[in-house]
Amino acid sequence: DSEFAELKIRGKIFKLPILKASIGEDVIDISRVSAEADCFTYDPGFMSTASCQSTITYIDGDKGILRHRGYNIKDLAEKSDFLEVAYLLIYGELPTIEQYNNFTTQVAHHSLVNERLHYLFQAFCSSSHPMAIMLAAVGSLSAFYPDLLNFKEADYELTAIRMIAKIPTIAAMSYKYSIGQPFIYPDNSLDFTENFLHMMFATPCTKYKVNPIIKNALNKIFILHADHEQNASTSTVRIAGSSGANAFACISTGIASLWGPAHGGANEAVINMLKEIGSSENIPKFIAKAKDKNDPFRLMGFGHRVYKNYDPRAAVLKETCKAVLKELGQLENNPLLQIAIELEAIALKDEYFIERKLYPNVDFYSGIIYKAMGIPSQMFTVLFAIARTVGWMAQWKEMHEDPEQKISRPR
């Protein structure tokens, strides 16, 4: 039998359907409130509002659980590769060997970008931020695929594959242009993660040998950042897509949202904070500053909008960080890691942080890994965008396949 919640407004009672979730909290359907009760609901930041039904990602923030299509994120990070997870998010199931081989072949086939796109890069000054270049380049893809501006259902999968394939190429080109080096073309003999590292660090006169530990770490980072429910950038992609805008335009809006320091730029802020702390001896002083309401200092990398427990992605990255630094001979002498480990240990025992449920999040260790890999801080958010493009495309595809989909129009 259907369940209802009762809402009393000005003496009149309205029955609101309670929608049963397949997992997690049930939802009160308020879609008819404005029409029947002559008033709106108010929820700044959509803290308590579900904007859509989705079967892609599930989070239980109190228990520190993150699942994609029912699979635990830790299992995916340790047992899958990024394109296998991409297939899972887009199609809803893990691929067979044949499906996986076909999918990876298609991604490799579409990794090249049109040569004319090179001219777009020349319009930027050499000091341009790679995210600014990437934002423009991704949006410009609309001009190269005019036949896909009016999407049909058959185009969803091809568009997703094209986007997943071309984003790493554009990302690497953005980096190469920012440092004045020639663009490096994709190499289809390499897998997805190896290919990106190749395009980032090879030159026409020097080959780049991919370290398997580095490759494995980056693969995990990509998986851990692939999707995360209706966050700011994903919601932005869905809102843009709800108007019928093409996927290239939608993804560029997601990149713009991700660029914000409160969203995709947090791991860079963690690195800056660890540098500011400087040494383990200074940690108590900065802990005190974080507790002081009148002090503008914030302890970056702690706390999360959703998680009120240890971020499961952070747990994987902590061990990944140690593995990378051990491989590079930095495990015992990397000052940022030592400060991070001691800062975490102190904070997790402090009543101030325990009461507020402030635990390390995914950004706390990822920046240290990137720095050890030789990836500059201005590229951190770019790598986030590479990974999250998979989630954006899965969400974009799901939105278009939803019979209840409407153009987004907050009041």
From Swiss-Prot:
Gene Ontology MF: a single term: citrate (Si)-synthase activity
GO cellular component: cytoplasm
Phosphoprotein listed as a keyword: no
Enzyme class, first EC level, given as a word: transferase
Any GO BP annotation: tricarboxylic acid cycle
The entry's keywords: Transferase, Tricarboxylic acid cycle
Lineage top rank: taxon: Bacteria
Record's catalysed reaction(s): oxaloacetate + acetyl-CoA + H2O = citrate + CoA + H(+)
Record pathway: Carbohydrate metabolism; tricarboxylic acid cycle; isocitrate from oxaloacetate: step 1/2
EC number: 2.3.3.16
Gene3D superfamilies: 2.20.28.60, Citrate Synthase, domain 1, Cytochrome P450-Terp, domain 2
Pfam families (alphabetical): Citrate_synt (PF00285)
InterPro entries in UniProt: Citrate_synth-like_lrg_a-sub (IPR016142), Citrate_synth-like_sm_a-sub (IPR016143), Citrate_synthase (IPR002020), Citrate_synthase_AS (IPR019810), Citrate_synthase_bac-typ (IPR024176), Citrate_synthase_sf (IPR036969), Citrate_synthase_typ-I (IPR010953)
UniProt keyword annotation of Transferase present: yes
Active site per the UniProt annotation: 304, 363
Family assignment from sequence similarity: Belongs to the citrate synthase family.
UniProt miscellaneous comment: Citrate synthase is found in nearly all cells capable of oxidative metabolism.
PANTHER family for the chain: CITRATE SYNTHASE
Name by which UniProt lists this protein: Citrate synthase
